[in-house]
């Protein structure tokens, strides 16, 4: 039987003392057999090149968290620094309620930076402050995926001595190359990037390190908990979140291992869920936060990435390559990246803007084509794929940032959308937003201020200046690749971002999808199993795992739309834009097409929630701990 070591939070509340006390006992739990990706024509994947220590199965989840609690159903407990917690009783099951000063939803760069800054202020001011971070992934960093050429500006401010504290930031960017690709050639262009002082990193590894720093300062971090609902008080103020119940079968009945979720409350709640956060989007709509500042709709891209181990002779640590052009058509914005990491590893990815028009376009297959370009193939040949993943990213920039403050908290990081598109960087801005929100939250709790100071300080920060200067880059490409390059070059090199106007985005991504009759189907080559691979093989490398016997977290608002609209009018685009083959059309008993949702394949990329032409798919959280288990991304 496979086994893994449960990592438990170094928390300081009596409620979690039982968890902490097990740290020295090396608690071992069984690892459930990993589920193979499911399709109607599923194939057996090859052996994973990752060693067993990189495989994660059933997480240390709500079952473990509650079963270790010493409380009886009628007890009240004293949380961190005097914050009370209580259990709420029903006739069916016990549902706990825990309270903190600050609750952070999501253990990514923004959420962990906020937690660290809060604890720093707590120590500086000698004021007790309880901070909790909940994370839907089985471990901190397990759902984190990014390029990533890291700009350390925010980290320098947050943890000035990180260079002496063994941060996983080791490979300085050594060179920048910018290529325009045709089918067979790569033309060098002047590089608009300046990565001097930046580092080629794995963001999932950096986030793990940040999680450790947050815990050292006293933050309670609970992975394996999916935040499924927002909690409000009688005045419609946000007071926390509810985690998803565990142990519910596909038909909605309670299984023998059923455990109710937990109500986790905060005097201030910060949402740091990443791009297209499910609860963040509800908050934005409920409080009309875009309308508050006349922000435009958000626009997105889908990033697909692999980490390869290549021959030593081809490895140039710190080399950074970006491309435009092939394999994408001139009307589709996007490009690829290839970053040389440490240990003979390279990060290769393709980013495709989700406002593409052709419903036959398949981002996953475009990525497979990319690897056969002579300039890319020459680097990869003889290498081995170590990991695969995908995630959407915000590309709306300055124009699309909503008012980030609501009654009871704020939205931070990529949930709000602080990516600098021409830089292809958002980690440093996400971290800074978390730090600014933390300072506002501390001021609101202990200095008589309010959370609006987050918005004020954000607009006075380098984040705002940086995004304002880059605001016209992405919408310039609404006019096509060449006009976009011309406009962005003029603004970048000549006008230095000081143009007197702001371009608007075009249609929302789902509205940009054309009817299938306007396009010719694209015939993609079959994978060769050496450079290009089928979806089940790639999924195996993502370590994705969900309990099959749970309700689908991918909900159809109208179950008839796939067969009556998407299939006949748009040629089933969900079967192509999803990089995990979650959506698959099969024949029913009468030989008619029927949508089958393979929810267990889901990489949590959120493309379906964004790109579905009729906005019929709603992405919600599955049981805590499900999804990918990235370790290199």
UniProtKB/Swiss-Prot annotation:
An annotated GO BP: response to absence of light
Keyword annotations from UniProtKB, A to Z: 4Fe-4S, Electron transport, FAD, Flavoprotein, Iron, Iron-sulfur, Membrane, Metal-binding, Mitochondrion, Mitochondrion inner membrane, Oxidoreductase, Transit peptide, Transport, Ubiquinone
GO cellular component, one term: mitochondrion
Intramembrane segments: 140-161, 401-421
Keyword Transport: yes
Domain of life of the native organism: Eukaryota
Gene3D superfamilies the UniProt entry points to: 3.30.70.20, 3.30.9.90, FAD/NAD(P)-binding domain
Necessary cofactors: [4Fe-4S] cluster; FAD
Catalytic reaction(s) noted: a ubiquinone + reduced [electron-transfer flavoprotein] = a ubiquinol + oxidized [electron-transfer flavoprotein] + H(+)
List of residues binding FAD: 102-116
Induction remark: By dark-induced senescence.
Positions that bind a ubiquinone: 334-335
GO MF annotation list: 4 iron, 4 sulfur cluster binding; electron-transferring-flavoprotein dehydrogenase activity; metal ion binding
Disulfide bonds: none
Similarity comment: Belongs to the ETF-QO/FixC family.
Purpose of the protein: Accepts electrons from ETF and reduces ubiquinone. May act downstream of IVD and D2HGDH in the degradation of phytol or chlorophyll during dark-induced senescence and sugar starvation.
Protein name, entry field: Electron transfer flavoprotein-ubiquinone oxidoreductase, mitochondrial
Species this chain originates from: Arabidopsis thaliana (Mouse-ear cress)
